[in-house]
Structure formats: C-alpha cells, structure tokens
Amino acid sequence: MDLENKVKKMGLGHEQGFGAPCLKCKEKCEGFELHFWRKICRNCKCGQEEHDVLLSNEEDRKVGKLFEDTKYTTLIAKLKSDGIPMYKRNVMILTNPVAAKKNVSINTVTYEWAPPVHNQALARQYMQMLPKEKQPVAGSEGAQYRKKQLAKQLPAHDQDPSKCHELSPREVKEMEQFVKKYKSEALGVGDVKLPCEMDAQGPKQMYIPGGDRSTPPAAGAMEDKSAEHKSTQYSCYCCKLSMKEGDPAIYAERAGYDKLWHPACFVCSICHELLVDMIYFWKNEKLYCGRHYCDSEKPRCAGCDELIFSNEYTQAEKQSWHLKHFCCFACDGILAGDIYVMVNDKPVCKPCYVKNHAVVCQGCHNAIDPEVQRVTYNNFSWHASTECFLCSCCSKCLIGQKFMPVEGMVFCSVECKKMMS
C-alpha cells in the first residue's frame, strides 16, 4: 500500500501544470510535460517556471513546509488547530488613497503577495519602492516574475526528499539532517519596519506565516510627510545609502538589529534577484536565496537539479552530476566513458549531436563528425579534407592555401570566381 501511495503521489506531481503553454517557446512547445527525473519539460526542455503554470495550493504547502520544525512551529500548529491552512500567501487589495473623494470610483490594486503588515499605507509604499516590473500585481509581469522566483529560489526538491529521484535511505537521512540544520541556522523571513522603530533593544517581533501579522502599524508615520526625506542613522546594508525616516525598510532577524535594507535591495548576493516573499538565508554576513544557499553547502546535479548527498558523483565541464544522471540531454543515454559534445552547457552523445546539431559540409553536404577536423568561415563549414575543401570552380584543394569566399562557395583565384559568376 505504501508503494502504491508513493507511485500515486509521484504521478500527481507529474500532472501539475500538465499542458501549460511555454512563455519562452510559445507555439513551438506542445505544452508542459514534466520529464521523469529532470525538472524540465519533455517537449521544449524549458523549466516549469518558464511555463504558464497556475499557482496552486502546492506552492502554499511548499512554503509552509519550509517553516515546519522551526521556531514558528507552535504558531503553525495554532493556525492549523484554528482551521487555517499551514501557510497562505498574503494576498492584499490596496485602495488608492485619492479615491476617497465623493463621486469618485474606488481604485484598488490586488497584489498576489504583500508584506505582512497591518498598515496598508506602509505596504503600499513598500510596493512602490520595488521596480515596477517586479511588483506582484495580479495578472501582471511582476506576478509572473514572483511565480518564477518561487520555483527558482525555493525548489521543493531542496527541502523534501519525496520530491527527489530515487534517493537511498542513507541519502534521505542525510538530506533530512541538512534541511534541519539550515532551518535552525540560516532560514529567516524579512520584516518591514520604519527606521524609527529600530532601537537599541531591537523589536521583539515574530513572523507568522499566513496568520495574524505581528508587526504593529506605525502610527502617524505615513502621514508625517515632513519626515519622509530626513536621513536617519541607518544606511542600507546593500547599497550603503542612508535610510529615510518615512520609508519602509527590511529587517532580517538573523542579520542583527544594526542592519536594514531598502525593499529593492533585499536581494540574493549571488543571483541578485529580489528574495521572493522576503524569505532569506543568512550565511557569512550575506543574504542568499534558498537555491544559492544550498549551492554554497552542497554540490548540485546539473542533470536533475537536485542536491547531491551521495558519496560518489562525477564532475565534468565544471559541473557536478549524479553518476546515473550524467546522460545525454537528448536521449537520456548514460555517457560514462562515451564521447559527448557540450551544447548550450548540456552534454549530448555523439549520435544525437550528429543528428541534431552537427554542421553540414558545404562540399559533400554530409554532417561533420565532432571528432573530425573542419574548416569554418563565417557560418559555413567544410571537412578539412582533399575531397571537400576544394575550389568551387576548378576543384583545386585549398587546404593550406589562400582562398576567396563567396557565400557558400570558395575559389582559388579571381579567374575561377569570374568563371562562376
């Protein structure tokens, strides 16, 4: 029965997003179909984050699971006992303040996520300080950006062994220990504050995933326009520019009370993308997204995108691979000991390369074997042989000789070129 449930669970995972169009390949992709062990589409080879997959409760569960067995556990348990989902992203509808006039229709903006604060004015200002193309307004480019970063920065297979491909019991145990360690030592959630709220003692606040928000509204702070442009004693930990009194700032508990960030500066130190939903990992005085924190701790398989917990793995082309996943990107044939060619940083076996990627010789019109020498000029190639690299007029061998290229033809002299004109 356990095996049956596991197989069913795996099948459901592969059904998620099935048929969703690719935003990158457009009509060239028949629709999203998850590869059996790679985290890509079988049809177009793009990742799930490149497809228009609707966010489901699975994303909420993924983020909620991230906070299990942390200091937030008791709060999560209370939310569950109250009948509230373990995690629910903070969808917020913000009202335009100028719309309060009589006979003026109310103008609202729906965000798919907003910072967990009670004060709408503070949340609105936080959003306005983000680049417009990254503001998660429902149905916008920014919402698509957030969805993509959720998949990229917080992959489920970095926290849940059941989302990985055929881990051994030892690997499962080691992964569980690794996840437990980063939850206790590195994982955190940013909190939106006003600089004036930061005192020597530090705020005694706790982030509640999906429940009531513990950050109190800043009374009168947003109405005091005169304070908005005054510098404070704080400077942004990222850009080093001073923080303004009336502007929201992000505080990260693991970094300490002496560090604040502008909303647009709260980014991963490796990929420099906004930390999605302000979820961060702190290490060596730097912010990381989940993916790049894990990359700094463990090798990642370039085939399946999972972290490697096996004692034996291979390294090739400055990348790491599970032994069973060092395969041809086209046919999935294992490449150990075989000749392969790198195409767009992906290994391809020799037969697949010749079939799908090899350049065609202008002389014999056959594919050029990757191990064979060739002559290339602009976008044209020839076998470097006495049978192929010849004058297009008199058939004189041009290897080691001067030649005159004309589109796909080559000539040994002006005379031969004129004769073919």
Curated annotation (Swiss-Prot):
Assigned keywords, A-Z: Cell junction, Cytoplasm, LIM domain, Metal-binding, Repeat, Zinc
LIM zinc-binding domain boundaries: 234-297, 299-359, 362-421
Taxonomy, superkingdom: Eukaryota
Localization per record: Cytoplasm; Cell junction, Focal adhesion
Keyword Disulfide bond carried by entry: no
Alphabetical list of SMART domains matching this protein: LIM
GO terms, biological process: negative regulation of cell population proliferation
CDD domains listed in its UniProt record: LIM1_Testin, LIM2_Testin, LIM3_Testin, PET_testin
KW Transmembrane helix (keyword) present: no
UniProt-recorded Gene Ontology molecular function terms: zinc ion binding
One GO cellular component term noted in the UniProt record for this chain: plasma membrane
InterPro entries: LIM1_Testin, LIM2_Testin, LIM3_Testin, PET_domain, PET_testin, Pk/Esn/Tes, Znf_LIM
Region (Disordered): 133-164
Recorded family membership: Belongs to the prickle / espinas / testin family.
Function: Scaffold protein that may play a role in cell adhesion, cell spreading and in the reorganization of the actin cytoskeleton. Plays a role in the regulation of cell proliferation. May act as a tumor suppressor.
Protein name: Testin
